Amino acid sequence: MNVLTVNPGSGSLRLHLVRAEDEKVLDSASTDDVSSFADRQPTISVVAHRLVHGGPDLVRPVEATPSVRAKIADARSLAPEHVPKTEALLDQLADLLPDATHIVCPDTAFHETLPSVAQTYPLPARWRFPWNLRRYGFHGWSFSWATRRAAELLHRPPGELNLLIAHLSGGCSVCAVSHGHSVDTSMGFTPLEGAMMTKRSGSVDPGMLLWLLREGKLTVSELEDGLYHHSGLLGLSGISDDTRDLVSDGSAEARFALAVFEHRIRAELAATAASLDRIDALVFTGDIGWDQPETAEAVAGGLGVLGIAGGLSRTRERDAVISPPGAKIPVLALRSREELELARAAAEAVR
């Protein structure tokens, strides 16, 4: 069974054709030219659409029926940077591939196992229940893959492992995985909460945001645009949102932006670790987690309080344990392979 995986990020679109039986990638591209990519494939049986926010109703991979499409529309305002892209791609690919089965794969599904104490905001019940104000979590397909792949490299079943995972890319979040299940994560109601990101602020004092609005310093649209597009590494450095550019730049502004970024990632990991009774490994994934050894070193090297140390290998030729032999807690770097998890989940959904 050939599965086309469609993975729209906040600033990218990644397409993969995966043979589900052996999880082999037959073709891939980072392109907006979906039509050309689909046309050059001999057969596509299933299309797996990554949906960043499933809202309260979409909690597992499901066929994109009209009723499901209506629920996706309801979630549009929860992730305005992402969900409309998925809706447009669903429309486009339904026209291009009318005979394929289209499966919607919510990124939030992995975090449905969050215990109520990790899922709940300390807000009045009269707000929480009517409006479904709770922590959903994101990057679920990345965390799912990282859990499975880390277990392979550590030669242990996923159900035996307690992992701290940092997905560091355009969006950044961390997750505590206990016995194969998400038990805590840094993102919440939207993909804006938690760790500092490349352009997004991550968590900031909501009282400060209320002050900016109340005092007329910013409009709601200006505030939203600033928090989503002009904060994070870009906002602090004034140079770039790319860690590679900032490392090579070496200016005081670049170094400071990276230092704040690394500090905020460490803080999120330490907080999330409180949901585990032990840590069997720290896992870095995502474009930055995989391919920016300076960041991994700075983060791991500052987590001595958790028994994690630096001295990591800078080599990134393949998924591997990058901590020194004999490290108390192994550190791994994994290339993110969300397409394999998406293909696997979609194939299971149609069986």
Task: Give names to the regions the model predicted.
Residues 319-351:
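Structural signal for terminal/edge beta-strands and the immediately following C-terminal loop/tail
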Residues 225, 232-236, 243-276:
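Adenine-nucleotide phosphate-binding core of ATP-dependent small-molecule kinases
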Residues 35-45, 150-157, 269-280:
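Phosphate/pyrophosphate-binding loops at sites that engage ATP/ADP/AMP, CoA/4′-phosphopantetheine
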Residues 280-303:
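Glycine-rich phosphate-binding loops at beta-strand->alpha-helix junctions
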Residues 40-86, 100-103, 108-121:
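Short beta-strand-loop/turn "lid" adjacent to the catalytic site in phosphate-handling enzymes
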Residues 2-5, 46-48, 103, 163-167:
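Short glycine-aspartate micro-motif
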Residues 113-215:
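Glycine-rich phosphate-binding loop of actin/hexokinase-like ATP-binding domains
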Residues 3-37:
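Short glycine-rich, Thr/Ser-proximal phosphate-binding strand/loop in the N-terminal lobe
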